[in-house]
Every structure is written in C-alpha cells, then in structure tokens.
C-alpha cells in the first residue's frame, strides 16, 4: 500500500524537480512527481530499475508509492513543477518516492565529493557493479550517486566481499540513485553508447583490473530471473501507464532479458572509448 505524504520540506536539485517529503511511515522521501518535466514514464523506469538493483545487490534507496493528498498540495504553493515562471501543481494521487537515508535534519548527504574523500568510500567497487546494470538497461544518463556516513552493516549486509568483523563500523558509503533515463528515458528503447552510465570521476574505476572485478554482478545479470521483472511490472500503478503502454512495457522487458549476453561487449566498448577511466584494466 502507498504511504501518504504528510509534510513538505523542500525542493531538491535536478532536472526532474523532485521534492523532499515526509510520509506517514515516518520516513522521508525524495519524490518524483507524475507531472515532472522528464515525463511520467520515468516513474516506471525508476520503479523497475530499483527492483533490478535490489536483486543484483547493488546499494540503492528503498522505494515506495507516495500518495500526495489534495490538502497538502493546496497548503504548499512550492510543491510543484516550475515551467517558465509558472508553478504547476501536481495532481493528487500516487507519485514515486525514493527513501532518504535518514533524518535530513541530522544526516548530511553529498552528491559530489573531492577525490581525497571519494577514495575512502567503503563500497567504491559498486561503481563497477552498477556500470554493468547501466549498460544492460541503456541508462542514457551519466551515473548518479549520493554519499553519506552509515553503519556498514545497514548498507553492505549482502556484500560477499566485505569482511564480517567490520560490519559494525561506520563509514562513507555510496548509494545509486536517479534511474529515470534507463531504457533511454521516455523512449523505451536501447540505443547503446559508450558514455552511457559512466560516472564522471575516473577515480571510482581505478581498481578495475579485469573481468573478475565485474563479478558477481555479470553472472547475476546472465541468470536474471524473469519473475523479478514480472513482479515489478505488477507493482506499477496503472495511473502511471496509458492502456496502450502496458503491452509496450511488457515487450520492453522481454527485450531487456534478451540482451543480457550483450553486457560484456558494451563494457568493453566503454573501456576502449574511455581508456583513462580504466587505466589498470588489462
């Protein structure tokens, strides 16, 4: 069941004009509105992408459908989409929510870090992991992430490579966000390009020395179960889809499964086009 928006905190940065909202479950969400300038299909893309990332065990925020009541919209003039000089209010109803990783009054979240801090990120290897995902889903955006300090157990509990004794420690971690441009955004196709999904800071890829550094995620993609996509498809609110789009989306996911074997060649094309990002990959 959706959570209900109870209070608005502030607008967030970015082209989709998201808003930070507190919900009835006590959590805060970065909410992408259904009337956002990038199109309602980006909500569908976000939902499917998170379900795939979760199965692949790549850190990303929890998601919920956020029900925004008309009473909150009426009481909050800044809750909406700015088009030119006009603020366009969202429709009441169901929107996409990406859970903020803590209390925004206490937790500092960064979307950019200097290299001296970036190299201390405890799960920097997940940038190799998420690159496999971005290639598979034809993420036509650059890789977006946020960084914050957290108990490592809470973020890396499913991480096979992480040493157990350090689980109780706190450290700087990365969480992968902003997947509206997967499937080439509203176009729902797969126009592959070497730059797609690449993080703009080469430092996150310097530890990559070969194909082993993309495991176990490449293997998880190759054996990805259709049932995960079926479940995600049935979770998507019908209000986010036109009747004619249901079949189109089903066909898109069929094509996604059919291109799993293409991911290694897409990674190699990226390495060849941007060798400075992968100086140690031989």
Predicted regions and their residues:
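Phosphate/dinucleotide-binding and metal-coordinating scaffold of catalytic cores
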Residues: 1-282
């Amino acid at each position: 069941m959706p959570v209900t928006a109870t209070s608005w905190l502030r607008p967030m940065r970015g082209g989709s004009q998201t808003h930070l909202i507190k919900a009835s479950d006590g959590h805060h969400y970065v909410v992408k509105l259904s009337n956002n300038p990038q199109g309602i299909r980006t909500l569908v893309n976000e939902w499917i992408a998170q379900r795939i990332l979760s199965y692949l065990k790549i850190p990303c925020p929890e998601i919920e459908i956020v029900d925004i009541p008309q009473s909150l919209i009426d009481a909050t003039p800044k809750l909406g989409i700015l088009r030119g000089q006009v603020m366009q209010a969202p429709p009441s109803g169901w929107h996409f929510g990406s859970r903020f990783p803590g209390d925004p009054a206490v937790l500092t979240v960064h979307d950019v870090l200097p290299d001296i801090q970036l190299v201390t990120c405890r799960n920097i290897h997940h940038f190799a992991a998420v690159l496999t995902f971005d290639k598979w889903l034809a993420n036509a955006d650059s890789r977006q992430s946020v960084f914050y300090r957290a108990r490592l157990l809470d973020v890396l509990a499913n991480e096979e490579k992480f040493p157990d004794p350090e689980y109780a420690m706190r450290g700087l971690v990365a969480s992968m966000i902003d997947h509206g441009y997967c499937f080439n955004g509203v176009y729902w196709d797969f126009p592959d390009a070497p730059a797609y999904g690449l993080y703009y800071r080469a430092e996150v890829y310097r530890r990559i020395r070969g194909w082993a550094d993309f495991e176990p995620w490449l293997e998880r993609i190759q054996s990805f179960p259709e049932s995960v996509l079926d479940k995600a498809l049935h979770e998507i609110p019908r209000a986010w889809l036109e009747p004619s789009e249901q079949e189109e989306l089903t066909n898109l996911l069929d094509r996604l499964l059919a291109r799993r074997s293409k991911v290694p060649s897409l990674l190699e094309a990226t390495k060849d086009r941007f060798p400075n990002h992968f100086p140690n990959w031989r």
